[in-house]
Amino acid sequence: MSNRAKSPALDAVVIGAGVTGIYQAFLINQAGMKVLGIEAGEDVGGTWYWNRYPGCRLDTESYAYGYFALKGIIPEWEWSENFASQPEMLRYVNRAADAMDVRKHYRFNTRVTAARYVENDRLWEVTLDNEEVVTCRFLISATGPLSASRMPDIKGIDSFKGESFHSSRWPTDAEGAPKGVDFTGKRVGVIGTGATGVQIIPIAAETAKELYVFQRTPNWCTPLGNSPMSKEKMDSLRNRYPTILEYVKSTDTAFPYHRDPRKGTDVSESERDAFFEELYRQPGYGIWLSGFRDLLLNKESNKFLADFVAKKIRQRVKDPVVAEKLIPKDHPFGAKRVPMETNYYETYNRDNVHLVDIREAPIQEVTPEGIKTADAAYDLDVIIYATGFDAVTGSLDRIDIRGKDNVRLIDAWAEGPSTYLGLQARGFPNFFTLVGPHNGSTFCNVGVCGGLQAEWVLRMISYMKDNGFTYSEPTQAAENRWTEEVYADFSRTLLAEANAWWVKTTTKPDGSVVRRTLVHVSGGPEYRKRCEQVAYNNYNGFELA
């Protein structure tokens, strides 16, 4: 390793202008360092910029997600709903960007196409889509866990004559602003019943002539329970921001919930059902995150809650055949992120809504007229692909990132990511991944956990600059220990039994299948404790030079 380090034009490049990216850029600038942010969109917002479909909103309590308000960056901010809609969330991020004056550090309508680590100079060369190359000491990815949209591999997908689009690329007008898609009198098809589809479907059903929902795998969905935010509640929350922040930091996922200390198997059936009923009626993720402590550890305890929610689905959906198709049979309750819904199940009681089970009759092709399955053809005017994302690592896979010895990140992580603290990977010095694989912000309330992680990264970078270090890379031993621990912790939970977005599945040339978790599931407090220990011990586990 060379002992010299060439001075780059920038201290850091931050990829992404979502809630975590703009905060990281702000912190680096505040510390007196030169930073450039790169954002593919026209403005800040991240997920709230790209996802503008009808029904899009937070599944986190607004006040608990709003780190910029909790931290006093925009203390005057007032939420209008307990679970804010996408337009309100975009206004919130824009207001925070104004307060931090962060846009001057960004280039918008710009993509990073490649990044190459130059070993002799200890810097990154970052190539933009206009072929310009900028150099930086630290490269920081803040692209988000769900930003690389995924279209299904269906024959004829480009042949459709009507309107079609992925849910995260909703149509825009000539100026780039989102335009409403009028479903009135139209035959609409929605492919996918994950969190996005669950939000779109009830809205589309209100005006569509006919709505066809193409479902392969049902999800466990529970009521969001949204309501307006009263002035009295908003004033009370604002007065308690420091306390609220400390509380959410104390929970495993930074949502405002602690698990019940009891085991589901230790409670009588009547007491259990009364508890489930109470949780089901509460707004938000309480039923997932404040239930019995063994929900995701014990199959019997999990089945108690799954059976309860299945009973609710049967009560809400009038057609028993449809109800059964909407009840998951392939994964435990909560082994996938639970979609929060508003009148989702009641939507299937409408005469104009039709559930198409594509596990029984798979989609064969998209035709100019619509969708053809194994047993029917559906003429459509609009097709919405609510088909999700290449999660967590997908956005990085789409950038040609090359570390030491010209090794590509996508090759290094071919069978699953390997990291230290989920923040750096060996072979890719000075490259940080915020809300990335195996760190404490991804299986978490990103609004808070991403902000806390950005603060830690700033501390490490500042420590390096103060001590004359220009190089950081995990030791092989530290990376191996962390990665093995992440995989082991995940495998002990029922999360390992679902094909959720946080599991990467790879088929090897010999036909064998490798499943690797993309997330750290041991809880935010434990994760931050580990990170603090590393920092306190002069960033042990990292090679600094």
From Swiss-Prot:
| BP GO annotations | (+)-camphor catabolic process
Site: Transition state stabilizer. Where?
337
Its pathway is: Terpene metabolism; (R)-camphor degradation
Q: Which reaction does it catalyse?
A: [(1R)-2,2,3-trimethyl-5-oxocyclopent-3-enyl]acetyl-CoA + NADPH + O2 + H(+) = [(2R)-3,3,4-trimethyl-6-oxo-3,6-dihydro-1H-pyran-2-yl]acetyl-CoA + NADP(+) + H2O
- Provide the cofactor list for this protein: FAD
Q: Which GO terms describe its molecular function?
A: FAD binding; identical protein binding; monooxygenase activity; NADP binding; protein homodimerization activity
**TM region(s), chain numbering:** none
What does the Swiss-Prot or TrEMBL cofactor note state? Binds 1 FAD per subunit.
Q: Which residues bind FAD?
A: 20, 39, 47-50, 59-60, 65, 112, 446
Q: Does the keyword Acetylation apply?
A: no
Name a Pfam family for this protein: Pyr_redox_2
| Keyword vocabulary terms for this entry | FAD, Flavoprotein, Monooxygenase, NADP, Oxidoreductase, Plasmid
What is expression of this protein induced or repressed by?
Induced by (+)-camphor and 2-oxo-delta(3)-4,5,5-trimethylcyclopentenylacetic acid.
- Gene3D superfamilies recorded: FAD/NAD(P)-binding domain (3.50.50.60)
- Cite the record's statement on how activity depends on temperature: Optimum temperature is 20 degrees Celsius.
pH-related activity note: Optimum pH is 9.
Q: What are its E.C. numbers? A: 1.14.13.160
Enzyme class name: oxidoreductase
Positions with a binding annotation for NADP(+): 57-59, 193-199, 216-217, 501
Q: Does the keyword tRNA processing apply?
A: no
Q: Which domain of life is it from?
A: Bacteria
Summarizing the function annotation, the protein's role is: Involved in the degradation of (+)-camphor. Catalyzes the lactonization of 2-oxo-delta(3)-4,5, 5-trimethylcyclopentenylacetyl-CoA (OT-CoA), a key intermediate in the metabolism of camphor. 2-Oxocyclopentyl ethyl acetate is also a good substrate, as is 2-oxocyclohexyl ethyl acetate and methyl-substituted cyclohexanones, but free acid is a poor substrate.
Q: Which family does it belong to?
A: Belongs to the FAD-binding monooxygenase family.
User: What is known about its subunit structure?
Assistant: Homodimer.
- What is the official name of this protein in its record? 2-oxo-Delta(3)-4,5,5-trimethylcyclopentenylacetyl-CoA monooxygenase
The taxonomic lineage of its organism, from the top, reads: Bacteria, Pseudomonadati, Pseudomonadota, Gammaproteobacteria, Pseudomonadales
Q: Which gene encodes it?
A: otemo
